[in-house]
Amino acid sequence: MPNYSRARPIGSTSIINFFLTLGSIIMSELYFPSLSPANSEGDGPTSIAELQGALCGLLCLQADASRTDWYKNLFEDFSPDEEEILDLTALFDQTIQSLNSLDFDFQLELPADDAPIASRVYALSQWCQGLIFGLGTSGLSDETDLSADSKEFIEDVINISQIDGSDVENTEEEQANIEELIEYLRMGLFLIFGELQPLTPDTDITEH
């Protein structure tokens, strides 16, 4: 298993607060930021960022989920076709392999670096909505044993999930801010994944 002590989130409180001042608060009926499993029903994800976030939340608590129909654990009314199932299986394999990588090479599914910053911020909020949804649906609760750092990270994710970002301008400073926020989310995910998931290096991470 990777040494997750390297994955302590960097101090990005000021960056998070900066983005929380931008745009309006988004409130999604399906992905309302709550860890309650009561919010586990819906028609499916609205974007690849949201889908990947939900998968990450699932894998943090159910690393033995089926690689071919893992989405059924999250979305009761989500009915992908055969081609989409292949894509979902590939996403599962790529995600769990990246989360178990010694190189910490997991990458968030976001618009390209040269896309408008507002669209990247919005995708970040969707990814965070998905992560919280996946964690809550998969069993995370107030009773789950987590470190103080992980609890703080989850609180930050809930806050970020409510960002709209429509007022963000395309400046170098804000581009640097969003890159720092992305890194914070990456490392924070490794932190909670390392605390919650039971996989070892000898476990086959794709055969389910």
Model-predicted regions and their roles:
Residues M1-C128, I132-H208:
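Domain-length accessory/inserted modules outside core catalytic folds
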